[in-house]
Regions:
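Alpha-helical DNA-contacting segments of helix-turn-helix folds
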Residues: 91-98, 137, 141
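Hydrophobic alpha-helical connector segments
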Residues: 93, 107-136
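Basic, helix-initiating cap at the start of DNA-binding domains
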Residues: 1-59, 63-72, 89-92
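Amphipathic alpha-helical packing segments from all-alpha helical-bundle domains
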Residues: 103, 121, 125, 132-136, ...
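Short linear capping/connector segments at secondary-structure termini
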Residues: 107-111, 142-151
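Short, structured helix-loop boundary elements
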Residues: 38, 45-46, 66, 88, ...
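Short hydrophobic/aromatic patch on the recognition helix
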Residues: 74-84
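Short alpha-helical scaffolding segments that buttress acidic/His motifs in well-ordered protein cores
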Residues: 130, 144, 184-188, 215
Length: 223
């Protein structure tokens, strides 16, 4: 039987961060690596994730505990905590497939989000596309980014978004592409977006337009 080489998942763990690339088509998709897993471990993982997704949808993410997930999945607490050390780890795992969908659109989808548009236009399209993604699962992304200090920067998905933004900014000739990528992604943090949408009651479409304009400003080349 193949050895179970998977470890516990949490929002503070590194999740297959993309390697440095030189071409947009080389950007790796999160989660494409082959991971060997025992059949019983795989079944338990699927049961846990299905239970977590169901409970999060029914009660909201803050209203669900790890004990609730273990009970709903029919697994022992030890089994749950060996694989997912906290709710942040559950959030990261649940988001994986959804994030890969957006990543695939970036890699091979139609322009302006995918290849074929000018770099500045692609950057603005990424902002709009990511905001739409974020709006659909804001609580999950918020949990995955804030469950432990620095959790957001350690996820493979964040590494992918940063590499993509940095690449496009480099292509536009913008100065300090690393810093500008970080500035743009800081505005797209789930906690910040939640504040704008739920505390300040900003309209999502208006916010997308404003942040896309900010992306275009960041993409301006050296004078």
């Amino acid at each position: 039987m193949p050895e179970d080489v998977t470890g516990p998942e949490s929002a503070s763990s590194t999740v297959r961060s993309p390697e440095p690339v030189t071409c947009r088509t080389q950007l790796p998709v999160l989660g494409v690596g082959v991971v060997r897993e025992r059949a019983d471990a795989a079944r338990n993982r699927l049961r846990v994730l299905a239970a977590a997704e169901r409970l999060f949808a029914q009660r909201g993410v803050p209203g669900v505990t790890m004990d609730d997930v273990a009970a709903a999945a029919g697994v022992g607490k030890g089994t749950l905590y060996r694989r997912f050390v906290d709710k942040g780890g559950l959030a990261v795992a649940l988001l994986d497939e959804r994030e890969r969908d957006l990543q695939q659109q970036i890699l091979t989808g139609p322009p302006p989000l995918g290849p074929g548009a000018d770099p500045a236009g692609r950057l603005a399209a990424f902002v709009a596309g990511y905001l739409a993604f974020l709006d659909r699962q804001l609580d999950l992304v918020l949990l995955s980014e804030t469950s432990t200090p620095g959790a957001r920067q350690r996820t493979g998905a964040h590494g992918f978004w940063r590499q993509h933004c940095r690449y496009l900014l480099t292509q536009t000739g913008a100065p300090n592409p690393d810093l500008r990528a970080d500035l743009l992604l800081a505005a797209l943090a789930a906690e910040q977006v939640r504040h704008w949408l739920h505390d300040e009651h900003r309209d999502l479409d208006d916010l997308a337009d404003e942040l896309s304009a900010a992306a275009l400003a960041l993409a301006k080349p050296h004078p």
